[in-house]
UniProtKB/Swiss-Prot annotation:
Its EC number is 2.7.7.3. The lineage of its organism: Bacteria, Bacillati, Cyanobacteriota, Cyanophyceae, Oscillatoriophycideae. This is Phosphopantetheine adenylyltransferase. It comes from Crocosphaera subtropica (strain ATCC 51142 / BH68). The record marks H16 as: Transition state stabilizer. NCBIfam families: coaD_prev_kdtB (TIGR01510), cyt_tran_rel (TIGR00125). It catalyses: (R)-4'-phosphopantetheine + ATP + H(+) = 3'-dephospho-CoA + diphosphate. CDD domains: PPAT (cd02163).
Length: 157
């Protein structure tokens, strides 16, 4: 079974990586898909995010990294994926993600959404939090993979 793990991943965090690592145990392939979000102003271009994700997932068999501009369910159909993989940190994530899962179901009845609760050590973690802390010179070494940490230091120096 193929799962799509969509997101902006700007940047990828250890929380995202945790979901990917657990996803490869459950699915034969996990396609981490950098989605274009017109409502966000990205720190890193899509190509850089693909590079970051590829580097920190290279040790994981069954992971592919891609990007897509459009509806996630259309991409899932294009890639013949049966599952959208989503991580949940807190209750407010569940409310938003459940609404999106129901919407996606109306667009693609054969694509299921599977939720994985994040490990508690990552329940506070978001890309936005990482960027805010890094912007002001705080340490994010416990929040992002090493290659992303280097990119953030370079960006904010």
């Amino acid at each position: 079974m193929i799962a799509i793990y969509p997101g902006s991943f700007d940047p990828i965090t250890l929380g995202h990586l945790d979901i990917i690592e657990r996803g490869v145990v459950l699915f034969e392939k996990v396609i981490v898909t950098v989605m274009y979000n017109p409502n966000k102003r990205p720190l890193f271009p899509v190509e850089k995010r693909i590079e970051q994700i590829t580097k920190c997932t290279q040790h994981l068999p069954g992971v592919e990294v891609d990007s897509y501009k459009g509806l996630t369910v259309d991409y899932a159909k294009l890639r013949k994926a049966q599952v959208l993989l989503r991580g949940l940190r807190v209750l407010s994530d569940f409310e938003k993600e459940l609404q999106m899962a129901h919407t996606n179901k109306t667009l693609a009845e054969d694509v299921q959404t599977i939720f994985l609760a994040t490990n508690k050590e990552y329940s506070f973690l978001s890309s936005s939090t990482v960027k805010e802390i890094a912007q002001f010179g705080g340490s994010v070494s416990h929040m992002v993979p090493e290659n992303v940490l280097r990119d953030l230091r370079e960006y904010y120096r």
